[in-house]
Amino acid sequence: MPLDLQSPPLIYLITSGETTDRTTPATEEFSVVLQLVEAAVGAQIDLVQIREKNLTASVLYQLAASASRITKGTATKLLINDRSDIAAAAGADGVHLTTYSLPTAAVRHTFGADFLIGVSTHSLAEATIACYGGADFAVFGPVFETASKKEYGEPPGLTGLTSVCSALSPFPVLALGGVSLDSVAECIRAGARGVAAIRMLQPAAQLADVAAEIRRRFAEEEF
């Protein structure tokens, strides 16, 4: 099922990264990630990123393959953080690249036109490289203050988001970092095609309600 990256509000769920190098398919945290993926499919979340950086390659592959079986044939697209090789081997839809990943152009050349590529960006320069390097979309942030992104300094806010979206339009940009239900509409108004989040979209039991509320608030806005 194709994904329309130009149709807001796109919702991009990122897993919490609470697995460890001791996680196995038999441990609870492995199952928790898969439960979240199942909830995402049920809530028709557009994109899910498996962002579990502490897992061994073997266990990450098993997790990605299990998640891929859940999302296959649904409206939810599955991306794996950084590891384009594991994403392809596990049957995921694509990869989410970071500042330290392989260059976007190299991944596109290696894995082809149908491989979905998202890229984390923190400036207009980085977003521009992602755009012209062959990414399908960029995630820009942190837009707002968030404890998990302190290393990136003062957040650019909606002004920074607007600048990036305007400069690269119609290239899809999603807002990340401190995004809440109350700020989703502001991000869309600034030019973002949607939002990416960890905390706002968890736990699994609340995901359907949160997604419905995002869509309801968007529908009530005039853009």
Placement of each model-derived feature along the sequence:
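Flexible, gly/pro- and Lys/Arg-enriched active-site loops
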Residues: 97-105, 143-168
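Active-site flanking residues adjacent to catalytic metal/cofactor-binding acidic residues
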Residues: 51, 141, 177
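Conserved N-terminal beta1-alpha1 strand-loop-helix module at the mouth
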Residues: 1-101, 109-136, 163, 169-172, ...
